[in-house]
Regions:
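Active-site mouth of glycoside hydrolases
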Residues: 1-202, 299-302
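A short acidic, glycine-rich active-site loop
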Residues: 4-6, 104-116, 262-273, 317-322
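Active-site clefts of carbohydrate-active enzymes
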Residues: 30, 144-155, 204-218, 229-275, ...
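Amphipathic alpha-helical segments in well-structured domains
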Residues: 48-51, 158-162, 225-226, 271-275, ...
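Aromatic-rich peripheral "rim/lid" segments of glycoside hydrolase catalytic domains that contact
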Residues: 89-103, 282, 293-389
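Generic structural signal for well-ordered alpha-helical scaffold segments
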Residues: 125-129, 229-230, 279
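Glycoside hydrolase catalytic-domain groove-lining segments
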Residues: 156-167, 171-258, 283, 288
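Long, C-terminal catalytic modules of enzymes
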Residues: 278, 285-288, 295
Length: 389
């Protein structure tokens, strides 16, 4: 979470060796926004140097990388530079963290605020310049679940932002891939920057999904859930899908997590079973690949810090434990890495339905899922409790 400030290339090499040992070939990581851009038009030379080092280590480890810009949203909180904040918050769902402390300020909407958008263009261009042509670079992720920070007022506003950031990257590196991390709530609600808008600049679409966060899933081990989201995303956006976040938090004797989030936590063997089945479903539905969230559990020394203090289940999503030992889920990653992609099958949904999907997105989404699973007349699944983040 704060690795850029406490950067250790040897730790990166150790962790990449573990990842590569499963057969995985790509790693996605976050560029904590305030670490890379301490002032609106100042990009940290030290952070860019660390970024190049990470790419070099990845290349030696035979891994490719997807750096994620403007992070932004992570583990149930929004990490935002002080200069990108303004005013007071209006009943915001997620806490805002700036300078390692929770602040009671709102986020300036970068889709509408020209100064923030220009600063983001600067960051995107300079980061892309730093890795232009690097053999380890797969491409750039234009944000992690950006709609958890702010949303455009109109589709055109969102499209203008996407075009500007994409153009900034491609002005210095025309050969890299682009994507942007959208998530379940971008399907459940019309946030005006969903799959169709993302598809305008993305080489492949990215989707994130967890059955624990959907009241309409069949439960925390609903292995069909992520494959359905991938199919919906491809249908709405018209491009192939790389599923860049799936996973499950596991039981670890953490009393806070058990008390606040017990219904979300799986035993480690159950988590492996879920991951194996979910990744198999993604492969069978034609996804270009799948990335798990996340590499390792958070060390207990930072459990009392935001956001982990109020979202204890976020401490335990790792495929490796905090001490570096692998959970059974790491074996699921190894099994899936050996599989080859299949071509997506045609979906049964009409163009007319697609054109009107966002008239009533959540109702439509739930109905489509229940029909896909043959649950049209079945009793709705019991709602899972979700902790306040």
């Amino acid at each position: 979470m704060r690795w850029w400030r406490r950067f250790d290339a040897k730790e990166v090499a150790r962790d990449f060796t573990r990842v590569r040992g499963t057969g995985a070939d790509i790693v996605r990581f976050f560029l904590l926004w305030e670490d890379f851009q301490p002032e609106p038009f100042t990009v940290s030379d030290e952070a860019l140097s660390h970024l190049r080092t990470v790419a070099d280590v990845a290349s030696r480890s035979q891994l490719q990388v997807i750096p994620t810009l403007f992070t932004g949203h992570m583990s149930g909180a929004n990490f935002i530079p002080e200069w990108a904040l303004g005013g007071t918050r209006e009943r915001a769902r997620f806490r805002v963290i700036a300078g390692e402390r929770v602040v009671d300020r709102g986020i300036r909407n970068w889709y509408a605020d020209e100064d923030i958008a220009r600063a983001q263009v600067t960051l995107a261009r300079e980061c892309a310049r730093a890795l232009a042509g690097h053999p380890a670079l797969w491409g750039w992720d234009l944000g992690n679940e950006n709609s958890n920070c702010c949303v455009p007022a109109t589709r055109d506003e969102g499209l203008r932002w996407l075009d500007r950031v994409a153009d900034a990257i491609r002005s210095v590196d025309g050969g890299c891939h682009l994507t942007i991390g959208i998530h379940l709530e971008d399907l459940e609600e019309d946030r005006r920057i969903g799959p169709a808008e993302a598809g305008r600049v993305s080489d492949v679409l990215s989707m994130h999904g967890y059955p624990i966060y959907a009241s309409w899933s069949a439960g925390p081990m609903d292995e069909a859930f992520v494959a359905f989201l991938a199919a919906i995303t491809r249908w709405l956006g018209g491009k192939d899908v790389l599923f860049t976040e799936l996973g499950a938090p596991t039981q670890d004797g953490d009393p806070d997590a058990e008390r606040q989030s017990g219904a979300m936590l799986l035993g480690e063997d159950d988590a492996r079973s879920y991951l194996s089945a979910a990744m198999r479903g993604l492969q069978q539905t034609g996804a270009t690949g799948a990335l798990t969230w996340c590499f390792a559990d958070y060390a207990s020394t930072i459990w009392n810090e935001p956001p982990l203090d109020q979202a204890p289940h976020e401490r335990h999503f790792g495929l490796w434990r905090a001490d570096g030992s692998p959970k059974p889920g790491a074996a699921a990653l190894a099994e899936s890495s050996a599989k080859t992609r299949v071509e997506p099958e045609p979906v049964p949904w009409s163009e007319e339905l697609r054109d009107h999907f966002y008239d009533s997105p959540k109702t439509t989404l739930v109905r489509m899922y229940r029909e896909r699973r043959g649950l049209k007349g079945a009793k709705p699944p019991q709602r899972l409790a979700r902790p306040l983040l």
